[in-house]
Design a protein with these regions (language model features):
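A short glycine-rich, His/Asp/Glu-containing loop-to-beta-strand
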Residues: 35-57, 62-63, 67-75
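Short acidic (Asp/Glu) patches
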Residues: 51-65, 93-105, 122-123
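Short histidine-centered beta-strand/loop micro-motifs
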Residues: 58-65, 72, 82-84, 108, ...
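A short hydrophobic beta-strand segment most commonly corresponding to one strand
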Residues: 71, 115-117, 133-145
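Conserved metal-binding segment of the jelly-roll/cupin
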Residues: 109-129
């Protein structure tokens, strides 16, 4: 997992080709101007979703991926994402994505100007409200490893 500020995103090039594609796309575009929905980068190998995600006061639903990483970027509001090692939880898979319920993990306080990358070994629990907000416009990039 990576949690950092967008001004340092370029420093993470070289970890894997898929992440490099997401980094290049992110740095080359006005993120607030991206249209809602799927923004193509490299077909099913890399893309960026722009959406408004609902936020709730608390949730225990974790997800993980088998072959893709996530790059998450909040654009207009804060969001808490909690993380745990995948080995600490039991998983049910629906194709590429696994879901499970689990106890609270380490909290990342995502605010505009920050980003997080979640690799297949990172269970992440998204959509927790920061300061009572009910939604967050965000980008979620996906890249195949």
């Amino acid at each position: 997992m990576i949690f950092d500020t967008l001004n340092r995103l370029g420093q993470y090039r070289g970890i894997c080709a898929g992440l490099d594609k997401l980094i290049d796309f992110t740095l080359a575009h006005d993120l607030n101007a991206l249209p809602a929905g799927r923004n193509e980068i490299d077909g099913d190998n890399a893309w960026m979703n722009a959406n408004v995600a609902p936020l709730v006061p608390e949730t225990d639903l974790y997800e993980r991926h088998l072959e893709h990483l996530d790059l998450q970027i909040p654009l207009d509001a804060g969001e808490i994402i909690t993380v745990r090692p995948v080995e600490e939880l039991e998983w049910d898979f629906e194709g590429e994505t696994g879901f499970t319920h689990g106890p609270a993990g380490t909290a990342l306080h995502m605010v505009p100007g920050t980003f997080a990358v979640f690799f297949p070994g990172d269970a992440h629990n998204c959509g927790i409200s920061e300061a009572g907000q009910t939604s967050c416009r965000k980008l979620v990039g996906k890249a195949k490893l």
